[in-house]
């Protein structure tokens, strides 16, 4: 996907020492459309998983852009934080955010294994279903 510009007063990436912080990447489909809605109401766990996967692909795009296309500069993924727009009774946030986690591990192998939080929220920017941010360690 194309690296999306921030929608507020912040930067998409920030390198501090050997760490690269990636701002929250929202769920956008392959055609550039926002994946909007609420888990437990408009989306199944499987659809949420796919939305989280798209967030991870956007994280990779931002990382590649920051590193001038050279993902070999990534030593490891430290942490992902996933936010799931969900109903009060929806409790499968971890299953949804597995979409992002599985994608990062698929791309980086063992170096992609990370710590994680999967958080429920009743609203996300622009009405999207999922948002994920990341922290990477660089070589």
Give the positions of each predicted feature.
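Short, polar/acidic, helix-capping and beta-turn segments at strand->helix junctions
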Residues: 1-139
């Amino acid at each position: 996907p194309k690296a999306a510009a921030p929608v507020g007063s912040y930067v998409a990436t920030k390198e501090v020492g050997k760490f690269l912080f990636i701002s929250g990447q929202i769920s956008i489909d392959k055609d550039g459309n926002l994946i909007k809605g609420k888990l437990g109401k408009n989306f199944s766990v499987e659809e949420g998983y796919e939305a989280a996967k798209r967030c991870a692909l956007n994280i990779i795009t931002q990382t590649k852009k920051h590193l001038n296309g050279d993902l070999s500069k990534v030593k490891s993924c430290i942490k992902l934080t996933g936010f799931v727009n969900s109903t009060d009774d929806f409790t499968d946030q971890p299953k949804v955010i597995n979409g992002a986690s599985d994608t990062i591990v698929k791309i980086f192998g063992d170096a992609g294994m990370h710590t994680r939080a999967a958080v429920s929220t009743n609203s996300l920017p622009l009405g999207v279903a999922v948002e994920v941010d990341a922290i990477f360690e660089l070589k």
